[in-house]
């Protein structure tokens, strides 16, 4: 039984799904997808549970969410192993994901009060109040790269605000979704408040097509995000939050410490085997001997990165990609770039057929035109050389995406210029592109999102504002508008 609907584990009526470890091929999880009827059943359960859940005090909802945080802490080792084995990432990185899930609870509680919550301003004849109300039934679509942390960033603030939820994990990480759902079950959520439906495209289409859905919160690829936006077009009554990918630029200016700059670049481009939406995809490097030295050092250090299994000791920096198919897609993208005129500096290699262990790739594209503006979701970095900083910014902005952007430079003036001219939701200075503060919004513009950033701002799209003018008594105003006569004299 792999679906959680209305407080019960049930067997899916859709196609059989088998999840294997992407490196070893070991079967980790299997079960049947939810069919359209079961998706509808989950929605009805969430709708029935909504009034009572929304009427609970914030404190009552907070207690259950904090109980979930405690369960994450006490089950950290087990959940870490599940995420690592299912995604292929090393144990150390999966552990940081579970820690981020735990920390998200306190952050979301604080954000609710700061970003939403209630406010009251006294007026001479009463008061002006601002309250926030939950939307109702929300669908949450989870991605595979952070199958615990990223959907958690939607689910927790949505529950705190009083919404009920239908959660569909990525079809590539059903085991992680199952494990997290079982912890929510132990936290004592009332039946129907949070429902789990497993499945791929058909399940997702059935979920997003539900008429009785009040909104959809999505993290994933731009292609899927565009499809969801099209599917929900003409329905302004539904909240839609899209956090999508990026073709992210990193600009390397003058650097005093080449190794520090190389470390930052590797952390930006290759962490999580390049499977973060904020990863650097395009590197813009200043022409000259210093740039040459940096590039040679980057290739040399990147060449030493050997992906390994989730439990290898010592731990590798990167593990496998989510699937062998995903790894092969990166290799194919590199081959296509080379065919277009790119100069390979470091060729990506599949270490073994039948696995997703892929070494990083670096290819120089200076002077090559007609390149597709697409995100390659893996450890492949394209390099361009530039002559002046204005040119670097123009090249960085030459994309339909707008998620993250970064600058390595000792000059504050150049960072200030980038802040004014960059088209990105995250702009970092001498910090990896993959770094973000939990107390800041997370999201992008253009093809990277629809201006509804998550993280600190998630509370904003999980509730709608209700403004009120209030007075505990009703009296006739001392001064009336022109043309109003409330005298006792009878007009004939």
Curated annotation (Swiss-Prot):
Active-site residue numbers: 243, 277
One GO molecular-function entry: aldehyde dehydrogenase [NAD(P)+] activity
Keywords, comma-separated and alphabetical: Arginine metabolism, NAD, Oxidoreductase
Catalysed reactions, as listed in the record: N-succinyl-L-glutamate 5-semialdehyde + NAD(+) + H2O = N-succinyl-L-glutamate + NADH + 2 H(+)
A Pfam family this chain is assigned to: Aldedh
EC category: oxidoreductase
Enzyme Commission no: 1.2.1.71
Assigned protein family: Belongs to the aldehyde dehydrogenase family. AstD subfamily.
Function: Catalyzes the NAD-dependent reduction of succinylglutamate semialdehyde into succinylglutamate.
The protein's name: N-succinylglutamate 5-semialdehyde dehydrogenase
Natural source organism: Escherichia coli O81 (strain ED1a)
């Amino acid at each position: 039984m792999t679906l959680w609907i209305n407080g019960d584990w049930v067997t899916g009526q859709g196609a059989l799904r088998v999840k294997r470890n992407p490196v070893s091929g070991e079967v980790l999880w299997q079960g049947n997808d939810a069919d359209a009827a079961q998706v509808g059943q989950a929605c009805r359960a969430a709708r029935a549970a909504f009034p009572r859940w929304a009427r609970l005090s914030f404190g009552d909802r907070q207690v259950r969410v904090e109980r979930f945080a405690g369960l994450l802490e006490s089950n950290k080792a087990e959940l870490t192993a599940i995420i690592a084995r299912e995604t292929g990432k090393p144990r150390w990185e999966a552990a940081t994901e579970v820690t981020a899930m735990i920390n998200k609870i306190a952050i979301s509680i604080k954000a609710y009060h700061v970003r939403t919550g209630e406010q009251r301003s006294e007026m001479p004849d009463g008061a002006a109040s601002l309250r926030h109300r939950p939307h109702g039934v929300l669908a949450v679509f989870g991605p595979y790269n952070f199958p615990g942390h990223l959907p958690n960033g939607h689910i927790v603030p949505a529950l705190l605000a009083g919404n009920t939820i239908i959660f569909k994990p990525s079809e590539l990480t059903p085991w992680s979704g199952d494990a997290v759902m079982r912890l929510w079950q132990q936290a004592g959520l009332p039946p129907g408040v949070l429902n789990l439906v497993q499945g791929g495209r058909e399940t997702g289409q059935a979920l997003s097509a539900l008429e009785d859905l009040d909104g959809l919160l999505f993290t994933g690829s731009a292609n899927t995000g565009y499809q969801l936006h099209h599917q929900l077009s003409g329905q302004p009554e539904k909240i839609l939050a899209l956090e999508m990918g990026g073709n992210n630029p990193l600009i390397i200016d003058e650097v005093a410490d080449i190794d520090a700059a190389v470390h930052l670049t590797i952390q930006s481009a290759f962490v999580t085997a390049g499977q973060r939406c904020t990863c650097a995809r395009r590197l813009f490097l200043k022409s000259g001997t210093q740039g040459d030295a940096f590039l040679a050092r980057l290739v040399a250090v990147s060449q030493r990165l050997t992906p390994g299994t989730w439990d290898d000791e010592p731990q590798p920096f990167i593990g496998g990609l989510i699937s062998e198919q995903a790894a092969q897609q990166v290799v194919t993208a590199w081959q296509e770039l080379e065919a277009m005129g790119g100069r390979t500096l470091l060729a990506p290699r599949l270490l073994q057929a039948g696995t997703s262990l892929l070494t990083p790739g670096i290819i120089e594209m200076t002077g090559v035109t007609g390149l597709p503006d697409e995100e390659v979701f893996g450890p492949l970095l394209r390099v361009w050389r530039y002559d002046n900083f204005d040119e670097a910014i123009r090249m960085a902005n030459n994309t339909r995406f707008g998620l993250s952007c970064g600058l390595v430079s000792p000059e504050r003036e150049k960072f200030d210029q980038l802040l004014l001219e960059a088209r990105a939701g995250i702009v970092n200075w001498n910090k990896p592109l993959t770094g973000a503060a939990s107390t800041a919004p997370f999201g992008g513009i253009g093809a990277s999102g629809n201006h509804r950033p998550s993280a600190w701002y998630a509370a904003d799209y999980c509730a709608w504002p209700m403004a009120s003018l209030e007075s505990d008594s009703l009296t006739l105003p001392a001064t009336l508008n022109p043309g109003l006569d409330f005298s006792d004299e009878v007009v004939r």
